[in-house]
């Protein structure tokens, strides 16, 4: 597993200089976008390959984010940090029927990501201990796959500024299977155009996924 690093950078020397000044001390700096994804391909691949739908979603999220430079920066405290790696977080039901948190390092190699996902989530479920990759820029996710929800807003503790995506049950239609997702991001990290590009690329990655 590759060792990732993070370092503090000068916001004034980045493309986020103005956003840093404008949003770092805002009482609510988080923005939420909603999007309906066509996940018919993921459902089909999951059934045919045995790969978990949630793992495929997490990989697609990481793949879409990995080509957008804003995902390698994150405001932490009162600083702007630069990362050289991305991870995707997933929530795991542990052996005590409680939830634990598991960061999975992103790899463009789907098979490798799947191996890490299965290994790490199994360990977290067994140990009931979170697996945190503090040196990676972590994209949070939460899959409430048994429930009909449209998304969530206002998830801001004032401590964690990480981007976060949540979804519920997918809907099977006559011609396609859809999934409504909500994507929350810190306005210092990215603008709306970057977030919209990310969501479009997520759909593109889903559409062209091959196993």
Language-model-derived ranges and their functions:
Residues 2-52:
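N-terminal beta-alpha "docking/capping" segments at the starts of catalytic domains
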Residues 30-35, 42-48, 99-111, 190:
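Acyl-group handling in specialized metabolite and lipid biosynthesis
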Residues 42-67, 179-198:
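Acyl activation and transfer enzymes in specialized metabolism, enriched
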Residues 71-103, 134-135:
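Small-residue-rich loop/turn and linker elements
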Residues 94-149:
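Helical lid/core segments from catalytic subdomains that handle acyl or acyl-like groups
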Residues 120-128, 132, 165-166, 183-185, ...:
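Plant-skewed but cross-kingdom recognition/interaction modules and surfaces
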Residues 152-184, 188-190, 195-200:
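Intrinsically disordered, low-complexity linker/assembly segments
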Residues 202-210:
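A common structural junction motif
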